[in-house]
Amino acid sequence: MKVTLDEVAARAGVSLATVSRVLGRRGAVAESTRAKVLEAMSELGYSRSTLLHDAPRRLVAVSAPGNPEHWQVQVCTRVAKALQDHDLLVTRPLVETDPEPLQTAIEAGAVALVTTTMTSLNTEIPCIRVAEQSATEEVSEAGTEVIAARLDLGGGMTTAFEHLRAIGHRRIGLICNDSGELAVQLIRRFLAEHPARNLGLNLEDWISRVPKSFSGGSRAVLELKDATCTAVIVQSALQLHGALHGLRNRHLQVPRDMSVVGFGDSPTMKFTGPPATVLGLDVEGLSNALIDATLQTLRISTTGLPSVPPVFRPRLVARTSTTAARQ
Amino acid sequence: MSEHLPEHRHVRLAEIAGTAGVSKATASRALRDPESVSAASSAKVRQALAILGAAGQTPYAESGTREGSGAGAGSGAGSSLIALIKPAVSAGNVDPYSRLAEILTNRMFGLGIAVVHIEAIAERNEALLETILGSEHGGPTISGAVVVGGGAAGVLAGMLAERGLPLIRISNARHDDGISRIYLDATGGIETAVAHLVHLGHKRIGLAVLRDSAAPARIAGFRRSMAGILHIPATRDQAPVVEAAGGAMAGVAAAEELLDLRCTAVIACAPSLSFGMLEAAQRLRLDVPRDLSLLTVGDVPDADVVQPPLSQVVYDWATVAQSAIDEIREMIAAGDARVHVDYTVDPDLVLRASAVPPQRR
């Protein structure tokens, strides 16, 4: 039975990062801690045959798309902090909207990319990312893509629809970005899970694809209002703020005249007018999945990944931007 | 004891082959003579070396990587990197410098400079110092640093300066540490804020500040402005001040304390405190701005889109970022002949809708 560093860390009661520092003789480790780790190694019979080496100094890119959502920034920050604890250098270029920053990072020596975007970026370096739960993407030829976690958008949509349907809404619209894999998947799940999908209506009329912007949101929500929607699900926080503003300008009241559900929580969602009901994501779980996959890819941890990446289903955080539909 | 340390200095061939997804024989040939294997295999092996951090470390890999591609896979020699150092922000807290860091990052990448992001944590600073400067362990070389904010980042800046790394700090407190700095002077902003609130008719104005090294200057500035503008003795009673720890909950506690003191307007000196104020107002069923006017010194995320849009005293981050980038590049280029810079930046008042004349109370 091979002894892993995780077991050594657990036995010594220290973190994995500390064990790798002791092994690599890098960074500051208190003498007492060092002794504890070495003792744990000899007790467990740790041998040098595992793949870990002296944690060379490497640069890793941790990236969110341009104009990122709050959850994407949060996940990136947590991942960056964890990688830094393993003595890796972190660079955070924006991706998706502009290829240049990532290219600069790769030229500077980035050996892997960790990203919260769902769009396949076709990088030459390994790309550790998130995907939609049921998305069947072909694994790129070079085998550089690692799916660390899957988002259950279908489940998230169902949750939102169930919430809105329970309070009497049928005419539910979707405001989403005009580009990006997340928007594509949201639309797919929207069409598949919509409560009115079997009523012979053209659901496309209730989908508004607009840029990820404030003005996009205001425009889209009024379009959907004119298409007689009584509730909308909004992909991006900027669009959500725009939608609330657009409705206010038209002297319409949220939630009386239009119920609004956002995607992704942030501290400001409590203070929108009115506080927004949102589908919240498990930021910590997502971050941990990305961190584990990254450490695995860089051969820092050797515990082995789950053969199926963990699935995260967004959860509804009910505030006051949704209410019963008026008959 | 130390000679029995299970240290690992070399990457094994099996490991390289495993990571690259080629056979050991192919890996071996690719390392010795890249011409003898297909271009694809050679690229895979080069990449595996980079992932394992072994580029240029294994004796025979050196020639292999260099010959294979002129661009050089992984080692990143030659390209310059600048570190962007910030104090780590605990989960759930609001980062007052997120906007500035974003602008700095995007501008530097725009100039083709790769940015290395460091989150300073007091108890990890020693290790971070080694990671930042330890290019002899492989990986890229960092040629300078922009340090934003104080706390652990300030301490790390001092350690890096001692080791001779070109540095520029952007911070809201002034220390005699001999490091070049752009000083964000909030006292002018606080004076503007007080003047604005007094002009609206407020007399009981409270100040909420974070308990950090910038607090004394801010409190003194506030008291001086109150005394000068309202012609009152700026005592604890007449010009109430609450010092709070970080985090939204501390903001709520500070807000409740100031509301107890019957303040009709509050100047919050950090975004977390502003969110605390909004939260406290919500809990007490007070309406901002009708029952309580709120001015923030600093950057509240989404300030323009929350309800009500928040009036702020903010810095021109784009200019601050550009100056910092220009200065650090000049300092790196100048080497030992670099000149010390010390700017002071005053903020501007951005009026939105969170401060109105006092209504009742």
Q: Which residue stretches match the model-derived regions?
A:
Chain A
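Short beta-strand elements in bilobed, periplasmic/extracellular small-molecule ligand-binding domains
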Residues: 83-95, 173-174, 189, 193-215
